[in-house]
Amino acid sequence: MPACSVTDIRSHVVEDSLPDQVIKGLKSSPKTLPALLFYSNEGLDHWNHHVSQPDFYPRHQEVDILKQRGDEMARAIAPNSVILDLGSANLEKVVHLLKALEAQGKDVTYFALDISAPQLEVTLNEIPTSEFRHVRFAGLHGTFEDGLRWISETPHICDLPHCVLLLGLTIGNFSRASAATFLGNIASQALRGASKDQSSILMSLDSCKVPTQILRAYTSNGVEPFALQSLTFAKTLLRGPMLHNDSDEPLPCYLQPDDWYYHSEWNFVLGRHEASLIPRYRDVHLGSLLQDITVKKDEKIRFGCSYKYDDMERHQLFLDAGVEQDVAWTNEGCDVVIYELKKRSNTEKLGIDRN
């Protein structure tokens, strides 16, 4: 099989707006950093090391479900489907589903979407293409929004059956209101067209709200280097568009990893894990490159949240997004569940749990 092709579907270069995003986030309350800062190759290496640790239950549970239930999931995907993987950091999980599709002789095309071109290349190079005859592979370089526009507007794609993969607990990275909006947007753009009745979303959610289990997971080995690498990457990216003052000297930017702690906490009220960076010793003055913003000692710069969903919150999410559960796959003792979602019909039907 020939090498996997990659199509650049970006509507704009995301990095161009990064300086404004960083400054806006650092001026907000609470202070935040944009997710793009964590997409360096080094950062992703640290992340993959972190999520492979024994205490990081979300990944292990999701992989086990795909291993044990992949054949059932594959049967739910229509022949000739376009499978769009939103954020395909690596293939360790989804390869079990793809192998099940191959074993069933289903002709489908898997599109790996990633905002990072280098990471996308790594992902595609990991695919053992010689093992597949029925499953074809390609890459899409762009954002979530670019991917949804592509699947809904591309002439030879829009009327085929669609299966959108939203794994890795990605939906948990959004606030509950934003998650419903995003999921509804996926449904409105991907679950339409001539084959809409054969189209679906496969999405994972985590129901764990045990603080000790969550904090062990999100403080396991590798997470602190992952968080701190974002500061080094930020300086590299920021000094492109905002490099010099009138004297042609580089503008100062004080984002030294040694000056910061990684901070992990469970928010009982909002039902989410929160990840932040906090000054280690004293107030940190970020320099003129970042408009002389000061971060007070013990002040948090939040860079990530992971919302957990109990039954009521999950039901509300699906209701607000205009989708309904068709099937749910999990294993005994698991907090993670993978749901097959369809666009909501006028009459809501009951989901079937396969435990």
Curated annotation (Swiss-Prot):
GO molecular function: methyltransferase activity
SUBUNIT field: Homodimer.
Enzyme superclass (EC): transferase
Function: 4-dimethylallyltryptophan N-methyltransferase; part of the gene cluster that mediates the biosynthesis of fungal ergot alkaloid. DmaW catalyzes the first step of ergot alkaloid biosynthesis by condensing dimethylallyl diphosphate (DMAP) and tryptophan to form 4-dimethylallyl-L-tryptophan. The second step is catalyzed by the methyltransferase easF that methylates 4-dimethylallyl-L-tryptophan in the presence of S-adenosyl-L-methionine, resulting in the formation of 4-dimethylallyl-L-abrine.
Organism listed in the record: Claviceps fusiformis (Ergot fungus)
Keywords: Alkaloid metabolism, Methyltransferase, S-adenosyl-L-methionine, Transferase
Pfam families, alphabetized: Methyltransf_33
Protein's name according to its UniProt entry: 4-dimethylallyltryptophan N-methyltransferase easF
Pathway: Alkaloid biosynthesis; ergot alkaloid biosynthesis
GO biological process, one term: methylation
EC number: 2.1.1.261
Family to which the UniProt record says this protein belongs: Belongs to the methyltransferase superfamily.
Record's catalysed reaction(s): 4-(3-methylbut-2-enyl)-L-tryptophan + S-adenosyl-L-methionine = 4-(3-methylbut-2-enyl)-L-abrine + S-adenosyl-L-homocysteine + H(+)
